[in-house]
Amino acid sequence: MSKVSGGSRRTRARRPMSNRRGRRSQSAAHRSRAQRRRRRTGTTRRARTSTARRARTRTARRSDLTRMMARDYGSDYRS
């Protein structure tokens, strides 16, 4: 009797058996995509900022080195 009074019967009546698998897979796909997006954005944002900073510092250092070398050797020295 307690089993019949539960809400499982109502949900089954709302969704037919043929449609249940497709709908469930779709919802699962959406959920997984949302989780993936959240995780990826956090990691990529951090990585992108760090890489950009590193690249900028490296380029600045290299330009300083080239400037010093050009001053020492003359305008013919490059990179």
From Swiss-Prot:
Cellular compartment(s): Nucleus
What gene is this protein a product of? sp4-a
Q: Which GO terms describe its cellular component?
A: nucleus
Protein name stated in the entry: Sperm-specific basic nuclear protein SP4
| The entry's keywords | Nucleus, Repeat
Mainly resides where? Answer: nucleus
Q: Where is this region: Disordered?
A: 1-79
sequence repeat start and end residues: 45-52, 53-60
Q: Where is the composition biased (Basic and acidic residues)?
A: 61-79
Q: Which domain of life is it from?
A: Eukaryota
Repeat: present as a keyword of the record?
A: yes
Origin organism is Xenopus laevis (African clawed frog)
Give the Basic residues compositional bias ranges.
Answer: 9-60
